Amino acid sequence: MTSKSKSQLLALSLVCGALLLTSRAAMAQVEFVGVNAKATLTDNNTVATVTGSIVCGPGDTFQINSVIQQNHAQTNVAGSGNTEPVACTGSPQPFAVQVQVVNPPNATFQKGPASAIVSAFTGPSDDSQTLTVKLLLSE
């Protein structure tokens, strides 16, 4: 084997090794597949369920947090909620977050447009991703 061939083989080996390490690191990350644009109202319009799907690497767990803000009748209504931790599989997994109205007290969501911040967190890899989405709240 010539010196040039050895150099090319070494370079190819380094590139393959870097790709392998990069793909393993990517598996530890959390990524939204999507967040549904429609959220369902329940519990006398005090809860909106935000749904979607996520991918994260095996060996991790994920948790989803969401905050919804809606302006109606000159009132700014806000709610928050989170899921329990779920084991990651490496494949797309559905989630549903029940977002409860928290402010003002005794307020309700109304059918119509709203904004949401949806965040995914994984452990033990300690990765996260956050999306801001427009929602349509409906019964």
Residue ranges and their predicted role:
Residues 30-73:
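Short, surface-exposed binding/anchoring microloops in extracellular/periplasmic proteins
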Residues 11-21:
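Bacterial N-terminal signal peptides
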Residues 21, 42, 131-133:
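Divalent metal-cofactor coordination and adjacent catalytic microenvironments
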Residues 24-28:
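Sec/Tat signal peptide C-region and signal peptidase I cleavage site
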Residues 58-129, 135-137:
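Ser/Thr-rich low-complexity repeats and stalk/linker segments
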Residues 2-12:
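Bacterial N-terminal signal peptides that target proteins for export
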Residues 30-31, 41-49, 82-83, 90, ...:
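Short boundary segments that mark the start of a structured unit
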